[in-house]
Amino acid sequence: MAEPVKIKIWSDYVCPFCMLAEGPLEEAIKDVGADVEVEWLPFELRPHPQPTLRPEDEYLPSIWERAVYPMARRLGVDITLPTVSPQPYTALAFEGYQYAAEQGRGAEYNQRMFRAFFQESQDLG
């Protein structure tokens, strides 16, 4: 029996591109038709004490209009710039992921965190 293809993904729950990439990744895995193991690894984009971004500042609305929203429309993904300000640190959310992964529910947890932040504007910190 062939070894599974292993994919490591470094991701942060406040990165819209990480959420947008989930669908294409799942489709690619189905298309390959091979046994694929996906390992999610935490990568906090702005760890404490570095300040996190604020949606009312110029950068976030600008990048969302130029890149995030067009990509989301192409992929058919419902995503909105969260109003949480400043954006949360995600270290605690990653601790939650570790527990969920140990229970075999890591992928489900990741999807829930992305939905909570990018569709419900919940503070993940």
Segments the model singles out, each with a brief description of its role:
Residues 2-25:
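Local sequence-structure signature of Cys/Sec-based thiol-disulfide redox active-site neighborhoods
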